[in-house]
Design a protein with these regions (language model features):
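Intrinsically disordered, low-complexity regulatory segments in ankyrin-centric signaling systems
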Residues: 1-29, 38, 130-147
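Conserved ankyrin/ankyrin-like repeat signature
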Residues: 22, 54-55, 87-88, 119-120
Length: 147
């Protein structure tokens, strides 16, 4: 995949290794927050998959797109579900990550099940159930329509 904002190896290493200060300096210097490596992984994907919560917080605060997929069609939440990083899963979900995004025929819950990450599986189920609940205005609208 050819991308105009190819991620420098040094930035990818900072994300993988959890160097929030070094990465912050690069972002302030103009590094695109959604730049990708040769496999389509963003900084957010790399930091998430390697369990680097502080870097994930920095990237989300800097405007990283939470559901960008890599070349395999995977999102950061899918990788986190497989690894079992509950704190990072919460950060991604709070930032709007889709808890049921199809990733090549699998969902984050499928990855959590495969890896035996029951705490992540419960979190994804709860978030999915909460997302499916009607909002207050929707409930009022349904009540009005039924009258």
């Amino acid at each position: 995949m050819t991308t105009p904002n190819l991620l420098p190896n040094a930035a990818a290493d900072l994300a993988r290794n959890g160097d929030a200060n070094g990465l912050s300096a690069l972002l302030k210097g103009g590094l695109a927050v959604d730049a990708r490596d040769a496999k389509g992984n963003t900084l957010l994907m790399l930091a998430s998959y390697h369990g680097r919560a502080e870097v994930v917080k920095l990237l989300l605060k800097s405007g990283a797109t939470v559901d960008l997929r890599n070349d395999k069609g995977q999102t950061p939440l899918g990788g986190v579900a497989f690894k079992g990083y509950v704190e990072i899963a919460n950060l991604l979900l709070d930032a709007g990550a889709d808890p049921v995004a199809d990733q090549g025929g699998s969902t984050p819950a499928d990855f959590a099940t495969l890896a035996g990450k029951t705490e992540i599986l419960a979190l994804l189920q709860a978030r999915r159930d909460n997302a499916a609940k009607p909002t207050r205005w929707y409930s009022k609208l349904i009540g009005w329509v039924r009258k």
